[in-house]
Protein backbone atom coordinates (compact mmCIF):
# COMPACT_ATOMS: atom_id res chain seq x y z
CA UNK A 1 0.00 0.00 0.00
CA UNK A 2 1.18 3.50 -0.82
CA UNK A 3 2.02 5.92 1.95
CA UNK A 4 -1.02 8.01 2.85
CA UNK A 5 -1.10 11.49 4.30
CA UNK A 6 -3.07 12.11 7.47
CA UNK A 7 -3.51 15.73 6.40
CA UNK A 8 -6.58 14.89 4.30
CA UNK A 9 -10.07 13.87 5.43
CA UNK A 10 -12.51 12.15 3.06
CA UNK A 11 -16.21 12.30 3.88
CA UNK A 12 -18.12 9.09 3.25
CA UNK A 13 -21.07 7.18 4.63
CA UNK A 14 -23.69 5.02 2.96
CA UNK A 15 -26.15 7.53 4.44
CA UNK A 16 -25.10 9.94 1.70
CA UNK A 17 -26.51 7.53 -0.88
CA UNK A 18 -30.00 8.12 0.49
CA UNK A 19 -30.17 11.53 -1.21
CA UNK A 20 -32.22 10.13 -4.11
CA UNK A 21 -35.30 11.63 -5.73
CA UNK A 22 -36.37 8.40 -7.48
CA UNK A 23 -34.82 5.44 -9.28
CA UNK A 24 -34.91 7.02 -12.75
CA UNK A 25 -33.62 10.43 -11.65
CA UNK A 26 -30.27 11.41 -13.25
CA UNK A 27 -28.83 12.57 -9.90
CA UNK A 28 -27.59 9.25 -8.57
CA UNK A 29 -25.35 9.19 -5.49
CA UNK A 30 -24.27 5.65 -6.33
CA UNK A 31 -21.48 7.50 -8.16
CA UNK A 32 -20.06 8.37 -4.73
CA UNK A 33 -19.90 4.71 -3.72
CA UNK A 34 -18.34 3.78 -7.07
CA UNK A 35 -15.63 6.41 -6.59
CA UNK A 36 -14.92 5.48 -2.98
CA UNK A 37 -14.59 1.78 -3.78
CA UNK A 38 -12.36 2.55 -6.76
CA UNK A 39 -10.01 4.51 -4.49
CA UNK A 40 -10.05 1.79 -1.85
CA UNK A 41 -9.51 -1.03 -4.37
CA UNK A 42 -6.60 0.89 -5.89
CA UNK A 43 -5.02 1.36 -2.43
CA UNK A 44 -5.21 5.12 -2.88
CA UNK A 45 -7.60 5.83 -0.02
CA UNK A 46 -7.02 4.59 3.51
CA UNK A 47 -10.02 3.75 5.73
CA UNK A 48 -8.38 5.91 8.41
CA UNK A 49 -8.88 8.96 6.20
CA UNK A 50 -12.65 8.49 6.01
CA UNK A 51 -14.77 10.65 8.31
CA UNK A 52 -18.49 10.33 8.94
CA UNK A 53 -20.82 13.25 8.18
CA UNK A 54 -22.99 14.67 10.92
CA UNK A 55 -26.45 16.15 10.44
CA UNK A 56 -26.42 19.94 10.15
CA UNK A 57 -28.61 21.77 12.65
CA UNK A 58 -31.50 24.01 11.64
CA UNK A 59 -29.52 27.05 12.75
CA UNK A 60 -26.67 26.01 10.46
CA UNK A 61 -29.03 25.48 7.54
CA UNK A 62 -30.49 28.91 8.18
CA UNK A 63 -27.12 30.54 7.74
CA UNK A 64 -28.32 30.58 4.11
CA UNK A 65 -31.83 29.15 3.92
CA UNK A 66 -35.05 30.79 5.09
CA UNK A 67 -36.90 29.36 8.08
CA UNK A 68 -40.11 28.71 6.14
CA UNK A 69 -38.17 26.83 3.45
CA UNK A 70 -36.48 24.52 5.97
CA UNK A 71 -39.88 23.85 7.54
CA UNK A 72 -41.32 23.07 4.10
CA UNK A 73 -38.56 20.52 3.47
CA UNK A 74 -39.39 18.88 6.80
CA UNK A 75 -43.05 18.70 5.81
CA UNK A 76 -42.15 17.20 2.44
CA UNK A 77 -39.99 14.61 4.20
CA UNK A 78 -43.14 13.21 5.78
CA UNK A 79 -45.45 13.71 2.81
CA UNK A 80 -47.52 16.40 4.52
CA UNK A 81 -46.88 19.30 2.18
CA UNK A 82 -49.70 20.86 0.15
CA UNK A 83 -49.55 21.15 -3.63
CA UNK A 84 -49.39 24.95 -3.43
CA UNK A 85 -46.61 24.83 -0.84
CA UNK A 86 -44.64 22.33 -2.92
CA UNK A 87 -44.95 24.60 -5.95
CA UNK A 88 -43.86 27.64 -3.94
CA UNK A 89 -40.66 25.95 -2.78
CA UNK A 90 -39.75 24.21 -6.04
CA UNK A 91 -40.69 20.71 -4.91
CA UNK A 92 -43.30 19.83 -7.50
CA UNK A 93 -41.40 19.05 -10.69
CA UNK A 94 -39.26 16.31 -12.21
CA UNK A 95 -36.03 17.98 -11.12
CA UNK A 96 -36.76 18.30 -7.42
CA UNK A 97 -39.46 15.88 -6.39
CA UNK A 98 -40.13 14.91 -2.81
CA UNK A 99 -38.65 11.83 -1.17
CA UNK A 100 -38.84 10.27 2.25
CA UNK A 101 -36.60 11.82 4.92
CA UNK A 102 -35.31 14.38 2.40
CA UNK A 103 -34.61 16.91 5.16
CA UNK A 104 -32.37 14.51 7.10
CA UNK A 105 -30.56 13.24 4.01
CA UNK A 106 -30.01 16.77 2.69
CA UNK A 107 -28.86 18.04 6.10
CA UNK A 108 -26.38 15.13 6.26
CA UNK A 109 -24.73 16.36 3.06
CA UNK A 110 -24.39 19.80 4.64
CA UNK A 111 -23.10 18.26 7.85
CA UNK A 112 -20.35 16.47 5.96
CA UNK A 113 -19.05 19.78 4.69
CA UNK A 114 -19.24 21.42 8.11
CA UNK A 115 -17.39 18.46 9.61
CA UNK A 116 -14.51 19.16 7.25
CA UNK A 117 -14.63 22.89 8.00
CA UNK A 118 -14.23 22.24 11.72
CA UNK A 119 -11.45 19.68 11.19
CA UNK A 120 -9.49 22.11 9.04
CA UNK A 121 -10.00 25.12 11.28
CA UNK A 122 -8.99 23.14 14.37
CA UNK A 123 -5.77 22.10 12.63
CA UNK A 124 -6.59 18.38 12.70
CA UNK A 125 -6.35 18.14 8.90
CA UNK A 126 -5.08 20.49 6.21
CA UNK A 127 -7.71 19.83 3.57
CA UNK A 128 -10.80 17.76 2.87
CA UNK A 129 -12.82 16.02 0.18
CA UNK A 130 -16.63 15.83 0.15
CA UNK A 131 -17.66 14.32 -3.17
CA UNK A 132 -21.20 13.73 -1.95
CA UNK A 133 -21.67 17.50 -1.73
CA UNK A 134 -21.65 20.33 -4.22
CA UNK A 135 -25.36 21.24 -4.38
CA UNK A 136 -24.80 24.69 -5.84
CA UNK A 137 -28.23 25.41 -7.34
CA UNK A 138 -30.27 25.49 -4.11
CA UNK A 139 -31.60 28.99 -3.41
CA UNK A 140 -32.20 30.47 0.06
CA UNK A 141 -35.92 29.82 -0.26
CA UNK A 142 -36.32 27.33 -3.08
CA UNK A 143 -35.03 23.97 -4.33
CA UNK A 144 -33.48 23.99 -7.78
CA UNK A 145 -31.47 21.82 -10.14
CA UNK A 146 -31.49 18.62 -8.04
CA UNK A 147 -30.36 20.63 -4.99
CA UNK A 148 -32.29 20.99 -1.71
CA UNK A 149 -29.79 22.61 0.68
CA UNK A 150 -26.77 24.51 -0.63
CA UNK A 151 -23.92 22.91 1.30
CA UNK A 152 -21.29 25.07 -0.38
CA UNK A 153 -22.95 28.37 0.49
CA UNK A 154 -23.70 27.22 4.03
CA UNK A 155 -20.09 26.14 4.53
CA UNK A 156 -18.77 29.44 3.19
CA UNK A 157 -21.04 31.40 5.52
CA UNK A 158 -20.15 29.11 8.44
CA UNK A 159 -16.43 29.68 7.86
CA UNK A 160 -16.96 33.43 7.58
CA UNK A 161 -19.17 33.72 10.68
CA UNK A 162 -17.58 31.17 13.01
CA UNK A 163 -13.94 31.53 12.01
CA UNK A 164 -13.74 34.97 10.37
CA UNK A 165 -12.43 33.46 7.14
CA UNK A 166 -12.30 35.06 3.72
CA UNK A 167 -13.72 32.36 1.47
CA UNK A 168 -13.23 31.86 -2.26
CA UNK A 169 -15.58 29.46 -4.06
CA UNK A 170 -14.20 28.05 -7.33
CA UNK A 171 -16.90 26.27 -9.34
CA UNK A 172 -15.93 24.34 -12.49
CA UNK A 173 -19.23 22.49 -12.96
CA UNK A 174 -20.73 22.75 -16.46
CA UNK A 175 -23.76 24.49 -14.94
CA UNK A 176 -23.49 27.96 -13.45
CA UNK A 177 -23.38 27.94 -9.63
CA UNK A 178 -26.37 30.24 -9.35
CA UNK A 179 -27.61 29.43 -5.86
CA UNK A 180 -24.17 30.04 -4.43
CA UNK A 181 -23.72 33.25 -6.40
CA UNK A 182 -27.01 34.82 -5.33
CA UNK A 183 -26.35 33.92 -1.70
CA UNK A 184 -23.33 36.25 -1.67
CA UNK A 185 -24.12 38.71 -4.45
CA UNK A 186 -24.06 41.74 -2.15
CA UNK A 187 -21.35 40.47 0.24
CA UNK A 188 -17.60 41.01 0.21
CA UNK A 189 -16.44 38.31 2.64
CA UNK A 190 -17.08 35.54 0.08
CA UNK A 191 -16.04 35.68 -3.58
CA UNK A 192 -17.69 33.31 -6.06
CA UNK A 193 -15.96 32.25 -9.27
CA UNK A 194 -17.79 30.07 -11.79
CA UNK A 195 -16.59 28.82 -15.18
CA UNK A 196 -19.36 27.02 -17.02
CA UNK A 197 -21.21 26.44 -20.25
CA UNK A 198 -23.02 29.58 -21.31
CA UNK A 199 -26.53 29.93 -19.97
CA UNK A 200 -27.80 30.66 -23.48
CA UNK A 201 -28.36 26.95 -23.97
CA UNK A 202 -28.10 25.32 -20.54
CA UNK A 203 -29.81 25.43 -17.15
CA UNK A 204 -29.97 27.60 -15.10
CA UNK A 205 -29.62 30.28 -17.78
CA UNK A 206 -27.56 32.62 -15.60
CA UNK A 207 -23.84 33.22 -15.15
CA UNK A 208 -23.34 35.96 -17.74
CA UNK A 209 -20.02 37.74 -17.38
CA UNK A 210 -21.85 40.97 -16.53
CA UNK A 211 -23.15 39.40 -13.30
CA UNK A 212 -20.47 40.89 -11.06
CA UNK A 213 -22.09 41.47 -7.67
CA UNK A 214 -23.75 44.56 -6.25
CA UNK A 215 -23.17 47.15 -3.52
CA UNK A 216 -20.18 46.10 -1.39
CA UNK A 217 -20.22 42.78 -3.24
CA UNK A 218 -19.40 44.32 -6.63
CA UNK A 219 -16.34 42.59 -8.03
CA UNK A 220 -16.80 39.60 -5.74
CA UNK A 221 -18.76 37.63 -8.34
CA UNK A 222 -16.80 36.38 -11.36
CA UNK A 223 -18.40 34.40 -14.19
CA UNK A 224 -16.66 32.84 -17.19
CA UNK A 225 -19.32 31.47 -19.58
CA UNK A 226 -17.91 29.25 -22.33
CA UNK A 227 -19.30 28.30 -25.71
CA UNK A 228 -20.93 24.90 -26.29
CA UNK A 229 -18.46 22.27 -27.59
CA UNK A 230 -15.52 23.90 -25.81
CA UNK A 231 -12.62 21.42 -25.73
CA UNK A 232 -9.85 20.75 -23.21
CA UNK A 233 -7.27 23.28 -24.35
CA UNK A 234 -9.72 26.18 -24.41
CA UNK A 235 -11.36 25.28 -21.10
CA UNK A 236 -8.05 25.04 -19.27
CA UNK A 237 -6.66 28.17 -20.91
CA UNK A 238 -9.67 30.26 -19.91
CA UNK A 239 -9.72 28.78 -16.42
CA UNK A 240 -6.08 29.56 -15.71
CA UNK A 241 -6.27 33.01 -17.32
CA UNK A 242 -9.12 34.09 -15.06
CA UNK A 243 -8.97 32.21 -11.76
CA UNK A 244 -5.46 33.00 -10.50
CA UNK A 245 -5.90 36.81 -10.70
CA UNK A 246 -8.99 36.39 -8.51
CA UNK A 247 -7.08 34.37 -5.93
CA UNK A 248 -4.14 36.79 -5.93
CA UNK A 249 -6.35 39.82 -5.45
CA UNK A 250 -9.00 38.52 -3.04
CA UNK A 251 -6.43 36.81 -0.80
CA UNK A 252 -8.75 34.12 0.59
CA UNK A 253 -8.03 32.26 3.79
CA UNK A 254 -9.60 29.09 2.41
CA UNK A 255 -10.88 27.79 -0.94
CA UNK A 256 -14.04 25.75 -1.53
CA UNK A 257 -14.03 24.09 -4.96
CA UNK A 258 -16.98 22.53 -6.77
CA UNK A 259 -15.80 19.71 -9.01
CA UNK A 260 -18.72 18.93 -11.26
CA UNK A 261 -17.53 16.52 -13.92
CA UNK A 262 -20.31 17.21 -16.40
CA UNK A 263 -17.97 19.15 -18.69
CA UNK A 264 -17.01 15.71 -20.09
CA UNK A 265 -18.11 14.94 -23.64
CA UNK A 266 -19.87 11.77 -22.46
CA UNK A 267 -22.12 13.64 -20.03
CA UNK A 268 -25.75 13.34 -21.17
CA UNK A 269 -26.98 16.70 -19.80
CA UNK A 270 -24.45 19.22 -21.15
CA UNK A 271 -22.79 20.35 -24.39
CA UNK A 272 -19.11 20.81 -23.55
CA UNK A 273 -16.53 18.64 -25.25
CA UNK A 274 -13.84 18.10 -22.63
CA UNK A 275 -12.18 14.83 -21.65
CA UNK A 276 -10.67 13.34 -18.53
CA UNK A 277 -7.56 15.40 -19.28
CA UNK A 278 -9.35 18.54 -18.07
CA UNK A 279 -11.06 16.77 -15.21
CA UNK A 280 -7.73 15.43 -13.96
CA UNK A 281 -5.96 18.77 -14.42
CA UNK A 282 -8.52 21.05 -12.72
CA UNK A 283 -8.24 19.81 -9.10
CA UNK A 284 -4.44 19.77 -9.29
CA UNK A 285 -4.47 23.41 -10.35
CA UNK A 286 -6.85 24.30 -7.52
CA UNK A 287 -4.54 22.44 -5.14
CA UNK A 288 -1.63 24.52 -6.48
CA UNK A 289 -3.66 27.68 -5.80
CA UNK A 290 -4.41 26.53 -2.25
CA UNK A 291 -0.78 25.65 -1.58
CA UNK A 292 0.33 29.01 -2.99
CA UNK A 293 -2.24 31.34 -1.44
CA UNK A 294 -4.16 29.73 1.47
CA UNK A 295 -1.48 27.65 3.20
CA UNK A 296 -3.08 24.57 1.68
CA UNK A 297 -6.55 25.07 3.17
CA UNK A 298 -9.14 23.79 0.70
CA UNK A 299 -12.32 21.71 0.70
CA UNK A 300 -13.11 19.98 -2.58
CA UNK A 301 -16.74 19.08 -3.26
CA UNK A 302 -18.38 16.97 -5.94
CA UNK A 303 -21.14 18.50 -8.06
CA UNK A 304 -22.71 17.52 -11.36
CA UNK A 305 -21.75 14.43 -13.30
CA UNK A 306 -24.35 12.15 -14.83
CA UNK A 307 -22.33 9.46 -16.57
CA UNK A 308 -21.83 7.60 -13.31
CA UNK A 309 -20.07 4.55 -14.75
CA UNK A 310 -17.53 5.74 -17.31
CA UNK A 311 -16.72 9.26 -16.15
CA UNK A 312 -17.44 10.11 -12.52
CA UNK A 313 -15.42 7.46 -10.62
CA UNK A 314 -12.18 8.11 -12.48
CA UNK A 315 -12.59 11.89 -12.48
CA UNK A 316 -13.60 12.22 -8.83
CA UNK A 317 -10.81 9.88 -7.75
CA UNK A 318 -8.39 12.52 -8.98
CA UNK A 319 -10.06 15.21 -6.91
CA UNK A 320 -9.00 13.24 -3.85
CA UNK A 321 -5.61 12.30 -5.33
CA UNK A 322 -4.77 15.96 -5.89
CA UNK A 323 -5.28 16.60 -2.18
CA UNK A 324 -2.91 13.85 -1.08
CA UNK A 325 -0.26 14.83 -3.65
CA UNK A 326 -0.51 11.60 -5.60
CA UNK A 327 0.21 11.79 -9.34
CA UNK A 328 -2.36 11.47 -12.09
CA UNK A 329 -3.00 7.78 -12.62
CA UNK A 330 -2.44 5.72 -15.76
CA UNK A 331 -2.75 2.07 -16.66
CA UNK A 332 -5.38 -0.46 -15.69
CA UNK A 333 -8.15 0.02 -13.13
CA UNK A 334 -8.33 -2.54 -10.30
CA UNK A 335 -9.84 -5.78 -11.57
CA UNK A 336 -11.66 -6.17 -8.26
CA UNK A 337 -13.59 -2.97 -8.94
CA UNK A 338 -14.44 -3.90 -12.53
CA UNK A 339 -15.57 -7.42 -11.64
CA UNK A 340 -17.87 -6.18 -8.88
CA UNK A 341 -19.60 -3.40 -10.80
CA UNK A 342 -19.76 -4.75 -14.36
CA UNK A 343 -22.92 -6.66 -13.46
CA UNK A 344 -24.67 -3.46 -12.40
CA UNK A 345 -23.43 -1.07 -15.07
CA UNK A 346 -25.72 -0.08 -17.93
CA UNK A 347 -22.68 0.23 -20.21
CA UNK A 348 -19.24 -1.31 -20.60
CA UNK A 349 -16.98 -0.24 -17.75
CA UNK A 350 -13.64 1.38 -18.59
CA UNK A 351 -10.55 -0.74 -18.10
CA UNK A 352 -7.99 2.04 -17.79
CA UNK A 353 -7.60 5.37 -16.03
CA UNK A 354 -7.20 7.13 -19.39
CA UNK A 355 -10.01 8.06 -21.79
CA UNK A 356 -10.00 5.86 -24.90
CA UNK A 357 -11.60 8.63 -27.02
CA UNK A 358 -12.80 6.07 -29.56
CA UNK A 359 -16.14 7.87 -29.69
CA UNK A 360 -14.82 11.43 -29.31
CA UNK A 361 -16.00 13.84 -32.00
CA UNK A 362 -13.73 16.75 -32.86
CA UNK A 363 -15.68 19.88 -33.65
CA UNK A 364 -14.88 21.66 -36.96
CA UNK A 365 -15.41 25.05 -35.28
CA UNK A 366 -12.76 24.42 -32.59
CA UNK A 367 -10.60 27.41 -33.57
CA UNK A 368 -13.57 29.79 -33.70
CA UNK A 369 -14.89 28.57 -30.34
CA UNK A 370 -11.48 28.81 -28.70
CA UNK A 371 -10.84 32.33 -29.99
CA UNK A 372 -14.24 33.52 -28.78
CA UNK A 373 -13.65 31.97 -25.34
CA UNK A 374 -10.16 33.46 -25.03
CA UNK A 375 -11.34 36.94 -26.04
CA UNK A 376 -13.97 36.83 -23.29
CA UNK A 377 -11.53 35.40 -20.73
CA UNK A 378 -9.02 38.18 -21.41
CA UNK A 379 -11.79 40.76 -21.08
CA UNK A 380 -12.89 39.28 -17.75
CA UNK A 381 -9.32 39.15 -16.43
CA UNK A 382 -8.75 42.76 -17.48
CA UNK A 383 -12.03 43.92 -15.92
CA UNK A 384 -11.30 42.10 -12.68
CA UNK A 385 -7.82 43.55 -12.35
CA UNK A 386 -9.20 47.05 -13.01
CA UNK A 387 -11.65 46.71 -10.10
CA UNK A 388 -8.78 45.96 -7.74
CA UNK A 389 -6.78 49.09 -8.51
Swiss-Prot record:
Q: Which InterPro entries match?
A: AcuC, HDAC_PDAC, His_deacetylse, His_deacetylse_dom, His_deacetylse_dom_sf, Ureohydrolase_dom_sf
Question: Which Pfam families does this UniProt record tie to the protein?
Answer: Hist_deacetyl
Recall the GO molecular function terms of this protein's record.
Answer: histone deacetylase activity
Record keyword Hydrolase present: no
User: Domain of life here?
Assistant: Bacteria
User: Where do transmembrane segments lie in this chain?
Assistant: none
Q: Does the keyword Transit peptide apply?
A: no
Q: Give the record's family classification.
A: Belongs to the histone deacetylase family.
- Cross-referenced PANTHER family: HISTONE DEACETYLASE HDAC1, HISTONE DEACETYLASE HDAC1-RELATED
Role this protein plays: Role in growth on acetoin or butanediol. Involved in the breakdown of these compounds used as a carbon source.
Protein name stated in the entry? Acetoin utilization protein AcuC
What is the source species?
Staphylococcus aureus (strain COL)
